[in-house]
Amino acid sequence: MAQGPARLTPLVVEGERYFTLQWQAGDTNGRSDVHGVIGNEFGFGARKVRLLIDSLDAAGGVTAQTIAYVPFDLPPGTRSYFEARVPARATSYRVSVFAWEWIQAGGGETLP
């Protein structure tokens, strides 16, 4: 039996330690989306923040995955709005921080 495509998982663990997420599902012009706010709770700024949105069925199984880009850098203690189209309306969604880069204070360099 053929195996389906591999599922994405966050590239950096413990994103919930550094960021807060609030989201809800919606419809914009007849298209399904997930939108919300991400907050940076850590002492460094973050950029190139990407979110992983899992579309879930009634049993909690993943039916689709979407990568969403946060449109702004997140200085420490700030929040930013995000919005992402999803392939189709799902029973529920799971949103997690997929990847990001830290910005060192003052130099604009990223942390390894």
Regions found by a protein language model. Give the residues of each.
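Beta-strand signatures of extracellular beta-sandwich domains
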Residues: 50-54
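Short, acidic, Ser/Thr-enriched surface-loop or helix-capping motifs
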Residues: 57-58, 74
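Short beta-strand and strand-turn-strand segments in soluble, beta-rich domains
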Residues: 16, 46-48, 58-68
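A cross-taxa feature marking solvent-exposed loop/turn segments within ectodomains of secreted
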Residues: 44-46, 90
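Transition segment at domain starts
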Residues: 1-31, 104, 108-111
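Short, solvent-exposed, Trp/other aromatic-anchored flexible loops in extracytoplasmic proteins
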Residues: 64-103
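Asparagine-centered strand-capping/turn motif at beta-strand->loop junctions
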Residues: 38-43
